[in-house]
Amino acid sequence: MNQNKLLIDIGSTYFKLSANGCVEQHFRDFNKDIYDDLKSKCEETISKYQKEDVYICSSANGGLSTLIIGLSKSFSLKYATNIAYNSGINIIDTVLYSHIKESSIPGDLIDVVIVVGAIDGVKGVFGQELLDYLEKINYSNIVYVGNQDDAHFIQQHIDNVVVLPNIIDHKLHIREEELKEYLTNLYQADIVGKEDIKHLYDITSNQIYPTPYIVNKTLSLLDGKFKVVDPYILIDIGGATTDIHYSKDLIMDNILNENEYDRLVFKKLGVFKSKESLIFSAKNNEFVYELLAYLKVTENIFQEQSEKALKVLMQLAIFLVLCKVSSYNKSYITLKLNALNSLIFTGGITKVLNQEDIQNIVSFFYKKILNSSHNPSIVMDSNYDIWTMAIRN
């Protein structure tokens, strides 16, 4: 790609521009449309570029949420959960169909419901119980990826359902491509479909992509820019979400096969828009008060609006996300963190924490949670080089 390009990232809290090797960052004004805010602060820079030379990515939607309904924990729920996580979708809950009558009803709007179960050739798996449950929940999209013999019943009784091939083949192997593509496209459509984002096509003629998607596509190139050693994890902590990208050889139970690297998006682990949910998650972690004492602060820090409070929130986000992908927490994909060689940090966190701040938290996590003296190297992407490299490529 020609170097004379303007690169723009629209985040949930900040937007940043990269031109001629220089990066500028601006805190968003939430009283303004994104386009108007961007133009008011960066008009001089933007006006120098033709629309075909402007490239934009965005993570401003904070990710999508899903509820998964499946027949078994060993196959349908397990397979669909892995595909959803690796498509950057946040899983609100999973429902075992045999317990659907007793299952709780989510209060929030679900972006997409996934229904899955049984191999092709098995019929009559889903019935009225499914329809009754769906009547009680509020969702925007629904996709069926179960046995094809029940597809007619599903289409006949559920409005606007999308039917895709079964994610479980006749040998009980996973078939991930169609569902992963559907979820990825849904995630992208949610971003570019927002009025704020659509307006940005006034300044670019190029496709607007989700930021986590393009960053993930660049991970194999990182060793040419940074001193990293596989296997590694890239953590991007922002205002609304925390994204984690990882080498697939770190996965304890790797059932997906398409990409060398995959990602998780934690929708409620941000330090600005998701601050309250981050604090809630922290207070529900049994080690958080010990961690606060280790950082020489009390829980009163949660009420503060200060630079110190922001640093502590960033450190908590690191600790919580490592907990979520470790053997301590079985709700997410478990990564072999004792095999980790490098931990890369990018995003706003590099403007708030220094290497020592991060190393202290990582060391605490390994000693307290994993009972290990393992010490992966910490790599800081302080100038957003990963994002710049991603969108250029």
Regions found by a protein language model. Name each.
Residues 204-211, 299-327:
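Adenine-nucleotide phosphate-binding core of ATP-dependent small-molecule kinases
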Residues 108-112, 269-304, 308:
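A structural-propensity feature for long, helix-poor, extended segments
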Residues 250-254, 327-334:
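Short mixed-charge
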Residues 8-13, 236-240:
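Asp-based phosphoryl-transfer active-site loop
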Residues 286-295, 316-321, 369-373, 380, ...:
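Extended, charge-rich intrinsically disordered regulatory tails
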Residues 1-7, 22, 29-32, 40-231, ...:
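Nucleotide/phosphate-binding catalytic cleft detector across ATP-hydrolyzing
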Residues 11-37, 78, 86-93, 255-277:
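Short glycine-rich, Thr/Ser-proximal phosphate-binding strand/loop in the N-terminal lobe
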